[in-house]
Amino acid sequence: MVREKITVSTRTLQWKCVESRTDSKRLYYGRFILSPLRKGQADTIGIAMRRALLAEIEGTRITRVKFAKASHEYSTIAGIQESVHEIFMNLKEIVLRSNLYGTCDASISIKGPGHVTAKDIILPPHVEIVDSTQHIAWLTEPIDLCIGLKIERNRGYFIKTHPNFEDGSYPIDAVFMPVRNANHSIHSYGNEKQEILFLEIWTNGSLTPKEALHEASRNLIDLFIPFLHMEEENLHLEDADHTISLSPFTVYDKVAKLRKNKKKRSLESIFIDQLEFPPKIYNCLKKSNIFTLLDLLNNSQEDLIKIEHFRLEDVKQILGILGKHFALDLPKKKF
């Protein structure tokens, strides 16, 4: 455990970790302070940060299970101590760490008798087990246990609402949130005119509290960046009728203006999440640090095809959207 003496800056606003410990492989704790803040600012930041920590950070979980010998979810199999449902519940608790975008497959293939744990899961190279000792099942006889798994990276949680079977696989509830809990408290000083924000974070081990704080902060910044590039548009308020009329202005109308201006800063104000890209393309671009239209135009077709998980069809789809809405194209190669 690491614990530091708390000192408060009187000039520059700064974060500091004042306590850090690992209670277990699946429970990390961190305590942070932010100071100095004016009265009222700590609560504003604390509420937003807690929300971002619990709801905006992505995690990786098992979402579907294919059990070859199971006739239904509540069946039992000779030679396995647990029921199929109990195995599903154990798989639900497995904590994974990855930079995965989208979904991937994993599996378990083992012969009994013996103890089946998380270390027996055969994973793709970009996915790791946080706690390899997590229990899955006990095999009491020399039988073969073969299970197919679907792994997904997402945020929030997925609750199965009905048995949506796909190729004999079963959906399981998945809690993607790597932050198990987050609390904030406020302490006043300086004649009650200044505040210190204390933020406590507990994670499941797939991220450290410091990593979670960094990602939550980045997600909040991403939400507010568009306001830095706002331009005055045709906005008319009719007080008498209590109505608001807005011009039918879209991101594509904005690009029409950009073609006339040809300004680099203007291109930076169009973010890729404003375009019509499918989630897979958007996630891959974001992973490659392509956030704006300008970032995208600085790449060639050859650059895009080198992006992990990108296919030629994805590049063609990007070219189609650029051509249709912006009358823009990407060179095949960089000169």
UniProtKB/Swiss-Prot annotation:
Subcellular location, principal: plastid
Entry-linked Pfam families: RNA_pol_A_bac, RNA_pol_A_CTD, RNA_pol_L
Domain of life the protein comes from: Eukaryota
Gene coding for it: rpoA
UniProt keyword list: DNA-directed RNA polymerase, Nucleotidyltransferase, Plastid, Transcription, Transferase
Region (Alpha C-terminal domain (alpha-CTD)): 264-335
Catalytic reaction annotation: RNA(n) + a ribonucleoside 5'-triphosphate = RNA(n+1) + diphosphate
Quaternary structure, from the entry: In plastids the minimal PEP RNA polymerase catalytic core is composed of four subunits: alpha, beta, beta', and beta''. When a (nuclear-encoded) sigma factor is associated with the core the holoenzyme is formed, which can initiate transcription.
Family statement drawn from the similarity comment of this UniProt entry: Belongs to the RNA polymerase alpha chain family.
Protein name: DNA-directed RNA polymerase subunit alpha
Top class in the EC scheme: transferase
Domain notes: The N-terminal domain is essential for RNAP assembly and basal transcription, whereas the C-terminal domain is involved in interaction with transcriptional regulators and with upstream promoter elements.
Biological-process GO terms, alphabetical: DNA-templated transcription
Source organism per UniProt: Cuscuta exaltata (Tall dodder)
